[in-house]
Structures are given as C-alpha cells and as structure tokens.
C-alpha cells in the first residue's frame, strides 16, 4: 500500500472522528439546554403551585388536569393572581419561558384582570414584547371587556403603537354590551371603533346603550332624583355624529327606539 493511500485513510479517519465528536457535543449541549429549560419550567410550576391554595376551573387544562398547576396554565395563574414583582426571580423565569403573546386568553388579558394590577408593570411587560391587545374569545368578543383595570390611561398604554381601532371595529360594541363606562365609551368611539358594528342579533352599539339607559333608570326610578340624562344624551349625540345608524333594525325586528 502506497504512502499516499495510507495518508488519505488517516485523514478520512480523523475527519470522521472529528465530525462524530462535534455532533455528539452539539447534541449533548442541546439536550442539556432542553433539560435546563424544562428544569426552569418545573421551578415556575413548583413556585406557583406552592403559592396557590385554590385553582379556579377556568384555569384547568380543558378538564384534563383538574386541580393541578401545569405548564399550560401556570403563566395564566401567575399573571391573574400574583402580586407581580418585576425584580423577582419568578418574574424573570416567567418572562424567559412563557409565551407572552399566546393567542386567546393571554397573559396580557390575565394581568388586566389582576386585582393588584400596576400600570408600571404593564409597561415593563409591553417592553418585553407583549403585544396581543386585540385577541378575542371563541364568541368573537375582546378579552379586554372582562378587565377590572382598563380605563383611558391603560388604553393609552396598550394602544400606544396603534393609530386607530379600525381593525377592532367591534370594540365599542363589546364594551357597551357588557359595561357602561362613559369616558371609555367616548375614548373607543373617537379612536375609530365602528358604531354600526352589529352582533349576531343585529344589535348595534346604540341599541345596547339605549338598553343600558332603559334598564338602569327603570331599576333606579324611585332611588334617583329627577334627571334630564344630560350625559347620556351627549353620548348619543356623539355616536350619531360618528355615523351610528339610528334606523338600524335587529332580527326581531326592532329599532333603537323600540329597544
């Protein structure tokens, strides 16, 4: 066998050895990284589980893990029930491993339902990339309508990068369907939410607003002093000025005047 052939075989053997060795190292590091990440997720679950004395059914994994904290619900519970401390070890782990922009009922919506909600924490979360203001539930309603903390100031923070609400045309409808917050109604209307957006029964924002007024004053007729409903009239004028159709008809059929 010639010296050249022997040299070629040696080079091939060395190359094969290096290739296999580097592949092994790469896979080893990958496995170690995955195990490390799983270890940190387990740590998050452990901390949250040890701090929770009760787990509402809404946070169960579709009933599969009832009564248990899991990787699927741990971040939701953290942002809903915990006093979020941005300097804590737990917060840093959550930021590192949780999907802050999970579609549906996301960490953002959970945090806006937190009774210890803090605008400064919200700003930090947004700085970390939280961006799913417009997520909707299975019925097509905005999750933010369930918030305990939303007001004009919080809306400004959440929508700082959004020029208008034209892509969330039903936001005003959602709020007037479930809430009766005068200043926020103006805010959403002025931002561009469609006043003629209708639900499955063809009820528009104006229908719901008139229903709120009717129900509220019927139930409080003997408790309140005489009022000319100046504030309510102002909003009705405003929503009409922004294009609300006062002749919109529902499936019943009924108009705004018959609501």
From Swiss-Prot:
This is Truncated Ankyrin repeat protein OPG003. Belongs to the orthopoxvirus OPG003 family. It comes from the Viruses. The N-terminus of this protein is hydrophobic. It comes from Vaccinia virus (strain Copenhagen) (VACV). SUPFAM superfamilies: Ankyrin repeat.
């Amino acid at each position: 066998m010639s010296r050249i052939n022997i040299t070629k075989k040696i080079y091939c053997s060395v190359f094969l050895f290096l290739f296999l060795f580097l592949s092994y190292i790469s896979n080893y590091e990958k496995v170690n990284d995955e195990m490390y990440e799983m270890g940190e997720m387990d740590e998050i679950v452990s901390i949250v589980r040890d701090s929770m004395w009760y787990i509402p059914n809404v946070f169960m994994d579709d009933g599969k893990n009832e009564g248990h904290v899991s990787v699927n619900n741990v971040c939701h519970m953290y942002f809903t029930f915990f006093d979020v401390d941005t300097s804590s070890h737990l917060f840093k782990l959550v930021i590192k491993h949780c999907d802050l922009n999970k579609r549906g009922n996301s960490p953002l919506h959970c945090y806006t339902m937190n009774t210890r909600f803090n605008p400064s924490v919200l700003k930090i979360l947004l700085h970390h990339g939280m961006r799913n203001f417009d997520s909707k539930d299975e019925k097509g309603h905005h999750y933010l309508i369930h918030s305990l903390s939303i007001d004009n100031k919080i809306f400004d923070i959440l929508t700082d990068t959004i020029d208008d609400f034209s892509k969330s045309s039903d936001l005003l409808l959602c709020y007037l369907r479930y809430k009766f917050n005068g200043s926020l109604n103006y805010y959403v209307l002025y931002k561009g939410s469609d006043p003629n957006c209708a639900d499955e029964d063809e009820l528009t924002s104006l229908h719901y607003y008139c229903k709120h007024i009717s129900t509220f004053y019927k139930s409080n007729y003997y408790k309140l002093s005489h009022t000319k409903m100046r504030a309510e009239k102002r909003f009705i004028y405003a929503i009409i000025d922004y294009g609300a159709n006062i002749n919109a008809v529902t499936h019943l059929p009924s108009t705004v005047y018959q609501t």
